[in-house]
């Protein structure tokens, strides 16, 4: 660029001129713009000739000359760049054949220096990675031999063998360490010899052992999870009650006790004689329409208590019977009328609660309503259901359409042939 400007500046002093170039520039500006500009540039740089005097050129050609000069500058710079590139020599091999020095390893390996996996060639054969530790191994071997140590290769092989054996058998690995703290255990307060949940602060601890009561102390140094002296006492009491209630041994003991009570109740019920019940009260239910056939014989007495009450029964039996009566009352039934429910089928109506529990039947019943014949004899309570409570045998056939109501084994009194439903 500097050379071209100097040539333009000193152009009038040189004797040589280029009339063809001037004529071409003056006569054909379009041609100069398209095709003649490179030719003019080449001529100017190679022959170092100057253009014509400024008087011969017209004003219309000045912008074109300026463009040509700019083009000359660009092309000249490109030529210089090409010359600079041609001077660079790339040497890929060492002339002396010496090994390269060992690479300097930094403290932290960079990502780009991490060795990649060997890529497969076009033939499908994998190339083995090149080892860079030839010089370092030789230096380490010589230094170790110099100081009387074993060879580096031998030590490396031994370490590899030892690591393989340890990884295979696991005998040389360090033992697995586990915590020895029992998480679910309750620590024992040694001065008192009680578990920490059973220590009573006011009784087991003297005044000197209550530093949290001193002014300015932090309770979190002595109580965790936001407890204080009083909430801790409530928590310990609750924990003790829960452990006593839901302990496996306590539950097993309660179950065993309940089984023994049930067994005693069953044995007492089986040992009672059949005629233990007292006489029942008089029948109070009206006679229903008679069923077919005459009344059957009276059934055997049940195991019920005395007629009219539960005085001779064990407490457990009385409690269960009270539960049964409560359940009947909950269903809308009147417990006082249970002796009349469905048992007034014939004249031999079972009276009172004594008939329910196997006592003998009540007094003679009245004639059947609309019956064609006399009523049968008074029926006694049959063999009782559920804890010996007999409700009479087949006595519900006469009462209000003849539904069989809780019949036992004994035959109750049946009315005469009446207008009831035939069964």
From Swiss-Prot:
Residues 360-415 have a biased composition (Gly residues). Signal peptide: none annotated. Pfam families: Fip1. It is found in: Nucleus. It comes from the Eukaryota. Residues 1-178, 278-307, 360-423 are annotated as: Disordered. Residues 1-11, 65-90 have a biased composition (Acidic residues). GO terms for cellular component: mRNA cleavage and polyadenylation specificity factor complex. Residues 19-61, 135-146 have a biased composition (Low complexity). Its main location: nucleus. One of its GO terms (biological process) is mRNA processing. Pre-mRNA polyadenylation factor that directly interacts with poly(A) polymerase. Belongs to the FIP1 family. This is Pre-mRNA polyadenylation factor fip-1.
């Amino acid at each position: 660029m500097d050379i071209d400007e100097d040539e333009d500046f000193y152009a009038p002093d040189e004797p040589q001129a280029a009339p063809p170039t001037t004529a071409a520039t003056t006569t054909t500006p379009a041609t100069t713009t398209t095709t003649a500009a490179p030719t003019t540039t080449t001529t100017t740089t190679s022959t170092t000739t100057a253009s014509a005097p400024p008087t011969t050129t017209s004003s219309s050609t000045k912008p074109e000359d300026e463009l040509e000069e700019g083009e000359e500058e660009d092309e000249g710079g490109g030529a210089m760049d090409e010359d600079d590139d041609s001077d660079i020599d790339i040497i890929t091999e060492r002339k002396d054949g010496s090994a390269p020095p060992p690479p300097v390893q930094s403290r932290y390996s960079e990502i780009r220096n991490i060795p990649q996996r060997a890529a497969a060639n076009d033939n499908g054969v994998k190339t083995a990675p090149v080892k860079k530790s030839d010089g370092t191994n030789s230096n380490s071997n010589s230094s170790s031999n110099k100081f009387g140590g074993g060879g580096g290769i031998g030590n490396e092989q031994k370490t590899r063998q030892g690591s393989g054996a340890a990884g295979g058998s696991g005998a040389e690995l360090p033992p697995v360490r586990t915590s020895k703290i029992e998480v679910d255990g309750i620590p024992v307060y040694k001065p008192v010899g009680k578990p920490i949940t059973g220590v009573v602060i006011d009784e087991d601890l003297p005044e000197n052992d209550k530093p949290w009561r001193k002014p300015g102390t932090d309770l979190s140094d002595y109580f965790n999870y936001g407890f204080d002296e009083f909430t801790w006492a409530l928590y310990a009491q609750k924990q003790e009650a829960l452990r006593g209630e839901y302990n496996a041994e306590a539950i097993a003991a309660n179950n065993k006790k309940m089984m023994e009570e049930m067994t005693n109740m069953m044995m007492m019920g089986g040992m009672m004689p059949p005629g233990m019940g007292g006489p029942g009260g008089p029948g109070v239910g009206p006679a229903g329409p008679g069923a077919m056939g005459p009344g059957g014989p009276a059934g055997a007495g049940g195991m019920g208590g005395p007629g009219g009450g539960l005085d001779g029964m064990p407490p457990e039996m009385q409690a269960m019977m009270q539960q049964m009566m409560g359940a009947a009352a909950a269903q809308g039934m009147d417990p006082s009328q249970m002796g009349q429910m469905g048992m007034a089928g014939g004249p031999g109506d079972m009276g009172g609660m004594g008939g329910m529990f196997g006592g003998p039947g009540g007094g003679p019943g009245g004639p059947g309503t609309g019956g064609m014949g006399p009523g049968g004899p008074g029926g006694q309570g049959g063999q009782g259901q559920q804890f010996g409570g007999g409700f009479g045998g087949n006595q519900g056939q006469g009462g209000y359409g003849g539904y069989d109501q809780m019949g036992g084994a004994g035959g109750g009194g049946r009315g005469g042939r009446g207008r009831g439903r035939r069964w």
